[in-house]
Structure formats: C-alpha cells, structure tokens
C-alpha cells in the first residue's frame, strides 16, 4: 500500500494493499475502498462511504460530506460509488438523507469532471459523464450513458433519462426523456441524440423507431397525455420506445417540451 506519511486515517477504514493515497488526504469513518483505486492529494472521504475498484480520485475531491439540507440532523447515511469511476479535482459528492433512501449512489464507469457536484440522495447510473461544474440537486436520478454538459444544473427531484444529452449552461427543472437532447436556460428538447446512439451501436432501425416516437409525442398535434399510448401501440415492440413511454408516464415533475412549443 502506497500511502503518504501525511495521510490521516480514522475509524473503521478498509484499504487494500494496492491502493495509493496522496499527501494530506483525510479518510474518516466507516470507509471501504476497492482494489486498485488511486486517491490524490488533499482528498476528503468521510462518513459511511464505499468506493469500488480501480477508481481514480483527483486532488481536492470531497466524498461523503454532510448533505446541504436544513432538515439533516446528523443521521447515519451513506455514499456508494461503483467501479472504474473517475472523480476529478474538487468534485463534491454528499451523502444521503432520511427524507429519501438515505444514500447517494454513483454507478460504474462514471466520469465526474472538475468541480461537478452530486448532491444528497442522487442516483447516477453507469457510464455517465458530467462535465466541469455540472451540478445535480438533491434526489436527482441520471440514467445510464447520460451526458450532462459543463455549468449545467439539474433541479432537485428531476430526472435525466438514459442516453440523453444535456448541453452546457442548461437549466433542467423538468424531466429529460431518454435518448433526447436538451439545451437552454429553461431546458427544451432538440430531438434525438442520434450521434450518441450511433456511437453506442444502436441499430438504425431502433434509432428510426425512437425518432418516430419523439415526433409523435413532442411534435404532433395529439394531446400530450394520449400521444404516449399511441406510440406504445405502434412501436411497443421496441424496448427503447417502451422505456421512453414509461419514463414520460411516470414523471412527477413534468417533462421538458420541444423547443418550438
């Protein structure tokens, strides 16, 4: 184990032999760190935190700090981070609250760029990228392979669907459906994330089905409540379309609209 002499470790901390920890890092509490993980200088990890294998945590990151919530009373909550996660400089990930499931979750193969923030009770899926200074409010859910651009902010309790792309400097207050592109101060939809879907190997037939579903739901004159049912009837054989319909029907905050609405 390569641990700098200035590192402070307190509590029930599990650190495998091949983990590396840089200077002036502080690890306190019930912390479990997976094999092959590398932790930089001046990192803070505290509370109930589980970090997976082969993660890279850069200088100044803070993981497991108390949530920024006025009703938090010091209860035992946690942070769970998956495998192969990259956490760049000065990222902050806060632990959960009793108002939700009590834990903040970051999946596998996630990249959190410098100064991005994952608030209490968030659930970030696998293969997500958050660019510099992107911010998630409390209780936000981000689906697998979503991309959130730099300096964007997602309102508490909002959702970003899988394979969606949120442009830089975007304010997200309503749910962003899977496979879509959103942008703007008050996020609007700009169609399907075709480039991203092709890069990830989606068949053209599936992409066309998703595009048709988008047109029916967001660009046709059909009533917004009726359109998803029609899409399900016409294109329900496609799993991706079913996911889009289910996401929209389950929305509690409402769904972002097409930019020309």
Swiss-Prot record:
CDD domains: LbH_UDP-GlcNAc_AT (cd03351). The keyword Chaperone does not apply. Its EC number is 2.3.1.129. It comes from the Bacteria. GO terms for molecular function: acyl-[acyl-carrier-protein]-UDP-N-acetylglucosamine O-acyltransferase activity. The keyword Iron does not apply. Signal peptide: none annotated. Gene3D superfamilies: Hexapeptide repeat proteins (2.160.10.10), Udp N-acetylglucosamine O-acyltransferase, C-terminal domain (1.20.1180.10). GO terms for cellular component: cytoplasm; membrane. Coiled coil: none annotated. Pathway: Glycolipid biosynthesis; lipid IV(A) biosynthesis; lipid IV(A) from (3R)-3-hydroxytetradecanoyl-[acyl-carrier-protein] and UDP-N-acetyl-alpha-D-glucosamine: step 1/6. Homotrimer. This is Acyl-[acyl-carrier-protein]--UDP-N-acetylglucosamine O-acyltransferase. It comes from Aquifex aeolicus (strain VF5).
């Amino acid at each position: 184990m390569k641990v700098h002499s200035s590192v402070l470790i307190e509590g029930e901390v599990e650190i495998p032999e091949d983990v590396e920890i840089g200077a002036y890092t502080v690890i306190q509490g019930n912390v479990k760190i997976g094999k092959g993980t590398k932790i930089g200088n001046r990192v803070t990890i505290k509370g109930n935190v589980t970090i997976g294998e082969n993660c890279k945590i850069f200088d100044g990151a803070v993981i497991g700090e108390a949530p920024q919530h006025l009703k938090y009373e010091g209860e035992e909550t946690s942070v769970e981070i998956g495998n192969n996660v990259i956490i760049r400089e000065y990222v902050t990930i806060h632990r959960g609250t009793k108002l939700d499931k009590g834990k903040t979750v970051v999946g596998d193969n996630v990249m959190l760029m410098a100064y991005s923030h994952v608030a209490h009770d968030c659930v970030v899926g696998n293969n997500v990228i958050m660019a510099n200074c992107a911010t998630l409010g409390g209780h936000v859910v981000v689906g697998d392979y979503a991309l959130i651009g730099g300096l964007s902010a997602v309102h508490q309790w909002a959702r970003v669907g899988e394979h969606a792309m949120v442009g830089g400097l975007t304010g997200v207050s309503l749910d962003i459906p899977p496979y879509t592109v959103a942008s703007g101060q008050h996020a609007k939809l700009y169609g399907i994330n075709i480039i991203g879907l092709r890069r990830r190997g989606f068949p053209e037939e599936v992409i066309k089905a998703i595009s048709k579903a988008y047109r029916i739901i967001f660009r046709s004159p059909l009533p917004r409540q009726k359109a998803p049912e029609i899409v399900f009837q016409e294109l329900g054989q496609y799993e991706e379309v079913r996911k889009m319909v289910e996401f929209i029907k389950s929305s509690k905050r409402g769904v972002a609209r097409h930019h020309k609405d």
